[in-house]
Each structure stands twice: as structure tokens, then as C-alpha cells.
């Protein structure tokens, strides 16, 4: 009781940050450059779907299922590393804000891979799934580049990981993302 004989007001609990005053999820709170409200809602739906125990957090088993449903291959070691990297409160689980951060990073990675695939397809004129010397010759000519076959072959040799004189998409992706470059 206070000095005037009144009880102090009861402590008010604050709603979780992802809910608005009415207790409804407000995607606008999570929108940022490169991420629309619609995308936030899609990610929230996945989060809710895999938060099977309704705790507003996802444990390692739930995270693996969520990543798989969004089209990502997720190995156990990767899942535990993601949780370790993103679990800012040390709970061993991921809340929605942490999950959103993870998914936006993965979506960005997936989108850039799709863009690189489009560029690869421009080089792969025969749609054979590989870039050959003939393909490079054609692109160089279209771009007005005067390169002899030895220069073009050197480009292929630098990108070709298995020595078959062809550049696969994986080779091309690795070069474009600077994962390998001899």
C-alpha cells in the first residue's frame, strides 16, 4: 500500500514486439529496404507454422522444418550454427525477429543466385547447361570484344573446376561470387 492507502497500479505486461495493441501481428513493424509487408507476412506464416508449440520461438527441430519448407537444404550442423549465430538472447531458440533476419539473408542469397543463373543462361547459347569455348566466342563477338581463342580458353580454364573444358553453372556461380578463382 502507498502512503495514501492506495495500492500501486498492477504491472502491465507489454505485448511481444511483433504484435500491435490489439494483439495482432503488424508486418509494417518489420518492413525494411528490400523486404515488403507481403514478404514479412509470408515469413511470419512459415514461422507460425513451424512454431508448433506456440511459444513464439522456434527450436532447432522446428527451424530445420521451416528452412526446408522455404526451399533451403538445411543440415543439422548448419541449423545449430544458425541458432548460435542468431540467438541474441541465449535461449537456444529463435524468436520471430531473429527468424526474419535469417530468412531475409537467405532470400537475398537465393535471389542473387537466380540473377547469376540468368547471366549464365545468356552465355549458354545452346542450353546445354555448360559454357563452352564456342559460347564464349559468340558472346565476345556480340559484345564487340576482339579476343583470340587462347584468351577465351584461358577464361574457361580458370573457371572450369573439373578440367572438362566446360564451365558448369556451379563453376560460373563460384567465379561470380568469388568462391574460387585460380
Swiss-Prot record:
Residue sites binding Ca(2+) 2 per the record: 87, 89, 91, 93, 98
Keywords, alphabetical: Calcium, Cytoplasm, Cytoskeleton, Metal-binding, Repeat
Cell cycle found in the keyword field: no
InterPro entries: CALM/Myosin/TropC-like, EF-hand-dom_pair, EF_Hand_1_Ca_BS, EF_hand_dom
EF-hand domain mapped to chain residues: 38-73, 74-109, 111-146, 147-182
Residues holding Ca(2+) 1: 51, 53, 55, 57, 62
Primary localization: cytoplasm
Misc. remarks from the entry: Binds two moles of calcium per mole of protein.
Task of the protein: Plays a fundamental role in microtubule organizing center structure and function. Component of the infraciliary lattice (ICL) and the ciliary basal bodies.
Name listed for the protein in its UniProt record: Caltractin ICL1b
Lineage: Eukaryota, Sar, Alveolata, Ciliophora, Intramacronucleata
Gene label: Icl1b
Amino acid at each position: 500500500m502507498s502512503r495514501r492507502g492506495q495500492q500501486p497500479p498492477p504491472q502491465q505486461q507489454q505485448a511481444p514486439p511483433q504484435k500491435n495493441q490489439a494483439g495482432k501481428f503488424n508486418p509494417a513493424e518489420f518492413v525494411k529496404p528490400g523486404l515488403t509487408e507481403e514478404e514479412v507476412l509470408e515469413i511470419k506464416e512459415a514461422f507460425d507454422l513451424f512454431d508448433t508449440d506456440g511459444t513464439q520461438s522456434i527450436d532447432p527441430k522446428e527451424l530445420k522444418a521451416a528452412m526446408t519448407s522455404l526451399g533451403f537444404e538445411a543440415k543439422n550442423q548448419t541449423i545449430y550454427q544458425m541458432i548460435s549465430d542468431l540467438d541474441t538472447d541465449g535461449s537456444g531458440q529463435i524468436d520471430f525477429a531473429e527468424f526474419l533476419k535469417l530468412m531475409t539473408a537467405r532470400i537475398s542469397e537465393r535471389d542473387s543466385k537466380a540473377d547469376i543463373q540468368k547471366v549464365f543462361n545468356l552465355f549458354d547459347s545452346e542450353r546445354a547447361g555448360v559454357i563452352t569455348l564456342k559460347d564464349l566466342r559468340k558472346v565476345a563477338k556480340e559484345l564487340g570484344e576482339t579476343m583470340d581463342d587462347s584468351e577465351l580458353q584461358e577464361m574457361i580454364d580458370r573457371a572450369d573446376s573439373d578440367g572438362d573444358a566446360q564451365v558448369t553453372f556451379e563453376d560460373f556461380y563460384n567465379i561470380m561470387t568469388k568462391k574460387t578463382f585460380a
